[in-house]
Regions:
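N-terminal signal peptide c-region/cleavage motif recognized by signal peptidases
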Residues: 17-19
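Absolute N-terminal positional cue centered near the fourth residue
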Residues: 4-5, 25
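N-terminal, motif-rich segments that launch catalysis or mediate targeting to/interaction with membranes
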Residues: 21-157, 164-296
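Bacterial N-terminal signal peptides
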Residues: 5-15
Length: 296
């Protein structure tokens, strides 16, 4: 069992949607740092060397910072032309309808045209892109530049598969149209709470959080079990958490249509997020070890 250290005050204080860390920032950094614990030594050396050679200035070039690169790249022109947003936004999620999930419809597994790199090829969901980038990272023919892009996208997209609100939709734009509050705090969206607020209660510094979670995985000896499966399996697992907990345990609506999250919902959500961070870190490491191992 993973170690949980929940501060009692977390269910008494207000959960305010003020910080913009989101899974895009703090969560991604935590997951990358967890993965760093489990990289084979030779693979870690390759990862560090590839990132050190990165000339892009959007982020720093340590593994935690590079885990945010795909989001920063996507959002560069969000308020202008939105060309990057239009091309890559669907790469970060899998929109499975809560009442009738259909993986084949959500992820159609398009084939990359011959000679087309994964960074330019078609895909309609995160599962497809993870599979494409993992294959490219292990390729003997892909250029160094394309392999670097594959690594940077994997650092981000594997994490996205494990955020329950990124792989589910209840006709509410993935939780963006559902307003909630906790402990009497100001309303925010359900997606924001799962993106950011619940993670914030684990702490402010991603490294000690990642170290603690990785230590919990070691003590529980669950790495091998966690690392099994495919991106599709992991997506359906996260979808189950969305259906059973994120949506399934919401209280009755208030008269204004929003939800007041009870203390047990908040506590359980933080524990669920912690588990998903662990799973994502372990599985990211497994993908990188496979793609950049003896055959990578």
């Amino acid at each position: 069992m993973l170690k949980y250290c929940l501060i009692p005050i977390l269910v008494a204080g207000a959960l305010l949607p003020g910080k913009a860390f989101a899974w895009d920032e703090e969560g991604h950094r935590i997951i990358a740092l967890i993965a760093d614990h489990y990289l084979d030594p030779a693979v870690k050396q390759k990862v560090d060397a590839m990132l050190a050679a990165d000339k892009d200035t959007l982020t720093q070039h340590d593994i935690a910072s590079e885990a945010v690169w795909a989001d920063a790249h996507r959002d560069l022109d969000r308020k202008k032309a939105q060309q990057r947003l239009a091309v890559t936004d669907s790469w970060h999620s899998v929109m499975l309808e809560l009442d009738h999930p259909d993986m084949k419809s959500a992820c159609t597994e398009p084939t990359l045209p011959a000679g087309t790199p994964a960074s330019q090829g078609p895909a309609d969901c995160a599962v497809d892109k993870v599979n494409q980038f993992a294959a490219e990272l292990s390729s003997k023919t892909a250029s160094a530049g394309e392999k670097l892009l594959a690594l940077k996208y994997l650092l981000n997209l594997v994490a996205d598969l494990h955020q329950p609100l990124y792989v589910s939709d209840d006709h509410n734009d993935g939780g963006e149209q559902t307003l909630v509050s906790g402990g009497g705090g100001e309303p925010g969206t359900l997606r924001h709470y799962w993106d950011s607020e619940f993670i914030d209660y684990l702490g402010d510094d991603p490294k000690p959080i990642a170290d603690d979670i990785a230590d919990g995985v070691r003590q529980s000896k669950t790495f091998d079990k966690m690392s099994k499966g495919t991106p599709s399996d992991w997506t359906l697992e996260a979808f189950g958490l969305a259906k059973e907990h994120a949506y399934g345990k919401l209280p009755a609506k208030r008269p204004d249509g929003s939800y007041e999250l009870p203390p047990d919902y908040v506590t359980d959500s933080i524990e669920t997020i912690r588990l998903q961070l662990a799973r994502a870190g372990v599985r990211l490491a497994a993908i990188l070890n496979h793609s950049l191992g003896a055959k990578g």
